[in-house]
Structures are given as structure tokens and as C-alpha cells.
Amino acid sequence: MEGKRLTSYAMEELECPKCGHKHSLKKYKVINVTEKAKLKEEIMKNRLYQFSCEECEYMAPLTYDSLYVDSRRNIMIYMAPVMNAEIKAEIAELEQEKGIDKRLVDNINDLKEKIMIADNHLDDRVIEIIKIMYIDQMKKEMEDDILLNILFDYNRDNYCFLVFFQKKGIGKIPLTREFYRQVEDKYKDAIKEHSMDSFMKVDMEWAGKILFKNHNKFN
């Protein structure tokens, strides 16, 4: 099992969709940042999952299935833009390893967010619950605008959420440690009940089920 978690990649020839120039690109199957720490920086700076044409300077994100491993943070994150039988079989094999948090994402932004949450020693399950709470407080703003996304972010020791609106653009909502701890304590039993030792897609849909189920209990 350990061998399946070592950094590995394959070279693939891709054609620029704009000018047709052919490129030989390194596509990672496994990214083990415990073994190769620099790869984390490459992800966070949008260099690793990126197509860049030196001929016409065309750039675009390149999302493909890969496994992110950080043994120090005790987490594995599988990014699968499209689920298929081969990926399901691979995930089933990886799930035999116990005692490590396993997450499933389908895009680069969610992968980066999970990495940031883990690096700050926070629980992504708590973060997703807080997102739902904050969205509930933004109902008035959402009457004449569309919420596109909400993502965890931080600057040194200050936590926040970046809120992406269609018209207003990007806003920021602070997150205090005190409020995080309150939510963590309040929902710890519900979180445990809805968690399992397998690859979980922990997002706002997952968090919404917890809040809906426990609405009457806490109100």
C-alpha cells in the first residue's frame, strides 16, 4: 500500500486548443508532499494543474484524477473530476488503509481549500457547517445577487471565508477561533455520526444534512 502513495507521474502529449502546438506535459497520479514538499507550493500557486503554451501563451486549468497525500497532516485527498469504474476500484483499494483522513473532491479549488484547512489543523467538516451558517446570514444579499462559491482562506493567523458573488464580486467574512470552537463542540456528536473511515465528499451538501437533521435539537 505504501508504494501506491509515493509520488508518481506520466508524460502525456497535449495539443494547445488555441494554436495547436504540441506539448509534453507531466501529469501526476500521486502527489506525496511528505516526500516532495515543493509540490504543495506548486499546487497552491496554480502551477501544477495548469496548461501553459509557450507558443501562444494560452493558459488554462488542467483538472485530472490524482491522489494528494500528506502523512504529516494525516490526510489523503483524491481529486476525481469524473468518477468511473477504474477510479472507484482504485479508491476501494486505498480505503483499506485505516487511521488516515480520506477526502474526495472534484475540482482544484476544493483541493486547495482542503489543503489549507489541514495545514491550519482545522476540521473541514466544521468549516463546511460554518459555511452553511454564514450563507443563512446572507439571505438578504442573495435576493438580488447570485452566490457562486464560498471558500476558506487565511492570512497568517487570521481565518476568513472568501465569498464569490456574480455581481458584487469577491467579499470576505472573518472567522474567529472562538466561533469555530463553539461550532465544533456543538456538532461534534453529529459530525461523528455522519463520518466514516472511507473517502468522504465533505462539502456544503454534506454539512446541510447535519444541520437539517439537528435543527430541532438545537433550536
Give short role names for the model-derived ranges.
Residues 2-8, 208-219:
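Short acidic DE-rich linear segments
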Residues 73-209:
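Long, contiguous alpha-helical scaffold regions
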Residues 21-23, 121, 194, 215:
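Histidine (H) residue identity feature
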Residues 1-82:
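N-terminal cysteine/histidine-rich coordination modules
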